[in-house]
């Protein structure tokens, strides 16, 4: 220590000799190996080849857990539960020894008993070993190498994004950012510890296996599909009758009469042109008024029943046709056709945004702004019980007349 301090601070050293000493004491920089991104990509692909058996095993496990073949998944779940519950300690040691010895024996037989094949034969068969050798001796052009590097970087970025998302979720649970999730996590950990302490290991493994197979969404989807198919097989007649059954008729003679009404012919269409183009918000209000007034002015239903009893089925059809024709005529008188396509009050042209609306009292065509007054149907002479509650649209002049 003292000699070094003297060498650094002593006045004997001349200034001319200092740079030479520092140059001699500097270490010679070693040449760092160049980073080859293409070799990194090749190493990644070789790693994929080596891990391909594990990837296939993971795909098989996911195939069973997703119940894509329900019978295989069910047999696997039941078989594993039976093994977990019935095997004793000696049997488990035997299973472990078997799982170690079988891969070792297969690898020895594949390597020792296989005949040495030529290069052309290996290229023809395209085994995994050939793929590894191809990756070691691969020669690619510059565009192909750039494409491989880009693909590798994309996969690496996706992997790092998933890892970052997992770490962020773990930190959110540990920092209690969401108390519900954190409480569920720690509750599950405490429950697992208690279960490991109270239950035997075989029961713990059986419960874990049952949770993996029966606690996912795919299992409930398969169960719902099978339940629906069983219901269709057991009750085919009820479904057919449900599709073919007519809608329920109203109580009283009027409902039965309306149900028996035949479909009107094109000459007896009940929807005039002005009613077809009315606003879709309340398409049936105007028809209810006309039908109710027609029912009030129609002859007594008892007289119609007497005529039907006297004249038979043909007279019944004639009565129905006459009733439909009277209703059609009343609708045509009530809703005159306006061929000009403009509002009677403000002369605004109807369009997609400017809807037309019929006044329920005078029958003229207005826009939705001019025909925006609502009055109860009872003010127009309707006597039905629901007429006190239901309202219809009328124009301003009709609103003043009906409000007096």
Swiss-Prot record:
Residues 1-92 are annotated as: Sufficient for homooligomerization. The keyword Cell membrane applies. Residues 51-64 are annotated as: Necessary for interaction with RAB11A and function in neurite outgrowth. Residues 1-205 are annotated as: Sufficient for localization to endoplasmic reticulum tubular network and for interactions with REEP1, REEP5, ATL1, ATL2, ATL3 and SPAST. InterPro entries: Protrudin, Znf_FYVE, Znf_FYVE-rel, Znf_FYVE_PHD, Znf_RING/FYVE/PHD. PANTHER family: PROTRUDIN (PTHR14543:SF1). GO terms for cellular component: axon; dendrite; endoplasmic reticulum; endoplasmic reticulum membrane; endoplasmic reticulum tubular network; growth cone membrane; membrane; recycling endosome membrane. Residues 1-20, 234-286 are annotated as: Disordered. Zn(2+) 2 binds at residues 359, 362, 395, 398. Can form homooligomers (monomers, dimers and tetramers). Interacts with RAB11A (GDP-bound form); regulates RAB11A. Interacts with FKBP8; may negatively regulate ZFYVE27 phosphorylation. Interacts with VAPA (via MSP domain); may regulate ZFYVE27 retention in the endoplasmic reticulum and its function in cell projections formation. Interacts with VAPB (via MSP domain). Interacts with RAB11B (GDP-bound form), REEP1, REEP5, ATL1, ATL2, ATL3, SPAST, SURF4, KIF5A, KIF5B, KIF5C and RTN3. The keyword Ribosomal protein does not apply. Coiled coil: none annotated. This is Protrudin. GO terms for molecular function: zinc ion binding. Keywords: Cell membrane, Cell projection, Endoplasmic reticulum, Endosome, Membrane, Metal-binding, Phosphoprotein, Transmembrane, Transmembrane helix, Zinc, Zinc-finger. It is found in: Recycling endosome membrane; Endoplasmic reticulum membrane; Cell projection, Growth cone membrane. Key regulator of RAB11-dependent vesicular trafficking during neurite extension through polarized membrane transport. Promotes axonal elongation and contributes to the establishment of neuronal cell polarity. Involved in nerve growth factor-induced neurite formation in VAPA-dependent manner. Contributes to both the formation and stabilization of the tubular ER network. Involved in ER morphogenesis by regulating the sheet-to-tubule balance and possibly the density of tubule interconnections. The gene is ZFYVE27.
